[in-house]
Amino acid sequence: MSTASKLCIVGAGVFSVYMVYFVHNNQIIEREKMSAGVQKDDERKRIKKERFEDLKRQQELRKFYESQLPVEEDEKGLRQTTQTTVND
């Protein structure tokens, strides 16, 4: 075999090994990115659930406080508490 053919075979082998290595590493990186995406989605869902629970608590507190304090609406539709004074 000539030197040129030997170099061609070695070059093809090196190129093949490099391509297998490159594709393998690329798959690992993509798998990590997909896993990170799932973790971010789980975190977003957790935050959304916490915010929804906070909203529900705030709505319950508002109903409770409005039932305890007399509330009126003025001409602009704004809510105001009426001041009640106790005279002894």
Swiss-Prot record:
GO terms for cellular component: extrinsic component of matrix side of mitochondrial inner membrane; mitochondrion. Involved in the assembly of cytochrome c oxidase. It comes from Schizosaccharomyces pombe (strain 972 / ATCC 24843) (Fission yeast). One of its GO terms (biological process) is mitochondrial cytochrome c oxidase assembly. Belongs to the PET117 family. It is found in: Mitochondrion. The gene is pet117. Keywords: Mitochondrion, Transit peptide. It comes from the Eukaryota. The keyword Hydrolase does not apply. It holds the Pfam family PET117. The keyword Mitochondrion applies. Signal peptide: none annotated. Disulfide bonds: none annotated. This is Protein pet117, mitochondrial. Transmembrane segments: none annotated.
